[in-house]
Amino acid sequence: MKLTYRNRIGSLENTFSSFTASLRIKPQTLRYFNWNQYIYLEPNVWTFYQENKPVSRLLVSCRVPEDGSEYVQQVDLLTPMTWEKCEAWSHTKVGRRGDRYKEMKERMAEECITLAERFIPGLHNMVAERYTSTPLTYRDYTLTPTGSAYGLRKDFNNPITTMLSPRTPIP
């Protein structure tokens, strides 16, 4: 790959990643719902990531029960998360990120569950186990540079800059 093409790709901005809290639900405590629920505390969709506030937007989604029952076994909570919130641990490896990283994930999970309780009252008491992932998790398992959820950020004002041809000359 030509160096100029590689530099161009490297200079393009990626989209946000997300923080995910996957919750294993206690048996027969939450009935299955066949839709995603979006929760927004504030309408500022363009600048929210610049603020250092608790989680204020959330996607609540549940899997179809594998056992065919009417009760949920897992609920996933997703909220946008920028790379900058994890950058302090970018040099670390999976499972070796330290207590501050674990504390940050626990705090984020608590904020997500608390916000989700607006839609599912009593969710805290329904959780048997929880697992979390951050942009670092996505980076390490999917090899996206900053754990990006949707790849390169597109610019409708200048679409040509983010258009990458699938055919490039091989030197």
In which residue ranges do the predicted regions lie?
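Conserved FAD/dinucleotide-binding core of flavoprotein oxidoreductases
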Residues: 24, 70-111
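C-terminal structured subdomain/cap of oxidoreductase catalytic cores
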Residues: 1-2, 9-12, 18-30, 76-81, ...
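Flavin-binding catalytic cores
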Residues: 28-29, 70, 97-136
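Mid-domain catalytic core of redox enzymes
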Residues: 1-70
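Short, low-complexity, polar/charged sequence segments that are solvent-exposed and flexible
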Residues: 39-44, 94-102, 146-149
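A glycine-rich dinucleotide-binding beta-alpha-beta segment and adjacent secondary-structure elements
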Residues: 118-171
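Flavin (FAD/FMN)-binding glycine-rich loop and adjacent Rossmann-like elements that form
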Residues: 49, 53-54, 63, 67, ...
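Composition- and surface-driven signal marking solvent-exposed, interaction-prone regions
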Residues: 35-37, 73, 90-92, 128-129
